[in-house]
A protein has these predicted regions:
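Glycine-rich, flexible N-terminal cofactor/catalytic loop recognition
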Residues: 1-49
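Generic beta-sheet signal
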Residues: 24-26, 87-91
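Short, solvent-exposed loop/turn segments at secondary-structure junctions
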Residues: 31-34, 52-54, 96-98
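Short, glycine/charged-enriched secondary-structure capping and boundary segments
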Residues: 40-43, 104-108
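Helix-loop module immediately N-terminal to the HCX5R catalytic loop
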Residues: 47-89
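Short, amphipathic alpha-helical segments
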Residues: 69, 98-101, 119-123
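PTP/DSP superfamily signal
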Residues: 80-88, 105-156
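A phosphate-binding catalytic loop at a beta-strand-loop-alpha-helix junction
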Residues: 89-105
């Protein structure tokens, strides 16, 4: 079963990620006009996208800084292509926890094996890609008060 891993841009030239092998894909997410890191490992396919880490409820000055529906559709197509061809996938963004995490999470939903990494998926990226797959996506609501109660063993 192919796997998918999210990581930070700085991890790519240092190879601080699993070696994806010869049948592999690298998806690079950068800010517009951002630096594209050169990978230390070889990848069969490399794909680059530019969009900011903007959530659905953010208000950017330029809406074109959001991930577009066209980009989401292409990302889903690439993940399906990689999965169908049993390609391991490494996906990076600047910090490796939001944009790349959303893409990795969608890949796991498609069927990729998970490589344990911290993820805080970008909700807009998740919503658009899940819609392209025809799957529902609800923004998770996190109950910090309940977590605190459990952590402290206290009752409010």
């Amino acid at each position: 079963m192919p796997w998918i891993e999210n990581c930070a841009a700085d991890d790519i030239p240092r190879a601080y990620h699993h070696d994806a092998g010869p049948n592999s894909m690298l998806i690079q997410i950068t800010d517009p006009a951002g630096t594209i890191p050169s990978p230390r490992h070889l990848f069969k396919e490399k794909h680059h996208f530019e969009f900011l880490d903007i959530e659905d409820d953010d208000q950017p000055d330029d809406p074109e800084m959001f991930i577009s529906e066209t980009q989401a559709k292409e990302l889903v197509r690439l993940l399906k292509h990689a999965y169908d061809n049993r390609m391991n996938v490494v996906v990076h963004c600047y910090a490796g926890v939001s944009r790349s995490a959303a893409i990795a999470q969608v890949g796991i939903n498609i069927g990729f094996d998970e490589v344990e990494k911290f993820r805080s998926p970008n909700t807009r990226v998740m919503r658009l890609m899940m819609a392209e797959l025809g799957l529902p996506y609800e923004v998770p609501h996190h109950n910090w008060r309940e977590d605190y109660r459990k952590y402290m063993g206290a009752k409010f």
